[in-house]
């Protein structure tokens, strides 16, 4: 938990997964502070009623974008949006190095976790199809290689790297790409934008409000399949999210590498 004190107002920044502890946190903080606010985010198109009830314990909930704010307002949560977000990489102000694109050797980059929401399995499956018999490369910087399709055109990096090394990957790539099903802040988009890289993704949810140009992948709003969602996240992933249309996304990537 991160906390910020302004006068008699306390604001905590906490991930939505910790909502079962919010009531105790608020009760303890109200012994010392007149106002207790929460800064958080969520990645789907709705919020579970149990989490809404916990949010209403705070005086105000602060979220990154209007898309999230509007959902909470419909549930009666007092809320405001920053319409801004950043990352430690961006805050470090790394040097942006211009790269001249080689159309015969394009480099695509995904930076993020490998889990059911991020949908990296579909991402690597698409690129294994599209990049076969080419010299183009997809770099996947992630936490684990589980169930990923790996070919000579797909490089998976799972070790921890510094912000300086991560900046080198962004400077090396020609495009940033993700097949994520849901997103609360859009870090890949914001970091790609910082490095002047085109972003390939769907355009749903918060992505509509990031202020970055997106090469759109076709997608559909779908019910969440909880088969591979850990038990502690089943209330966190609530409502619907967005699934990439795999066959039509293959066509989009093929068009990019043929231009």
Task: Label the predicted regions.
Residues 1-12:
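Single conserved hydrophobic/aromatic residue that forms the stacking wall/gate
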Residues 49-50, 85-101, 105:
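Acidic anion/phosphate-binding donor-loop and adjacent secondary structure
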Residues 78, 82-93, 221-223:
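Short beta-strand->alpha-helix junction loop in the catalytic core
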Residues 142-168, 175:
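Nucleotide-activated donor-binding/catalytic signature segment of Leloir-type glycosyltransferases, i.e.
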Residues 181:
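Aromatic "clamp/platform" in nucleotide-sugar-dependent glycosyltransferases that forms part
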Residues 198-201, 216:
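Short hydrophobic beta-strand element within catalytic cores of glycosyltransferases
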């Amino acid at each position: 938990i991160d906390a910020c004190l302004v006068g008699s107002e306390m604001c905590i920044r906490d991930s939505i997964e910790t909502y079962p502890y919010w009531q105790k946190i608020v009760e303890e903080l109200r012994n010392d502070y007149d106002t207790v606010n929460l800064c958080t985010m969520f990645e789907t198109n709705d919020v579970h009623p149990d989490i809404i009830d916990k949010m209403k314990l705070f005086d105000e909930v602060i979220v990154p974008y209007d898309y999230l704010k509007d959902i909470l307002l419909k549930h009666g949560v007092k809320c405001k949006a920053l319409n801004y977000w950043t990352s430690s990489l961006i805050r470090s102000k790394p040097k942006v190095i211009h790269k001249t694109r080689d159309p015969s050797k394009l480099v695509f980059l995904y930076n993020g976790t490998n889990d059911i929401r991020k949908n990296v399995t579909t991402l690597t499956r698409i690129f294994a199809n599209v990049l076969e018999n080419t010299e183009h490369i997809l770099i996947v910087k992630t936490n684990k290689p589980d169930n990923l399709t790996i070919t000579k055109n797909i490089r998976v990096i799972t070790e921890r790297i510094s912000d300086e090394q991560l900046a080198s990957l962004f400077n090396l790539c020609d495009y940033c790409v993700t097949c994520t099903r849901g997103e609360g802040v859009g870090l890949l988009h914001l970091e790609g934008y910082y490095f002047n890289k085109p972003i390939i993704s769907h355009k749903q949810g918060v992505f509509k409000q990031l202020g970055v140009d997106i090469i759109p992948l076709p997608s559909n709003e779908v019910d969440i399949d909880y088969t591979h969602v850990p038990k502690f996240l089943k209330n966190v992933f609530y409502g619907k999210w967005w699934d990439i249309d795999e066959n039509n996304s293959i066509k989009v990537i093929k068009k990019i590498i043929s231009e």
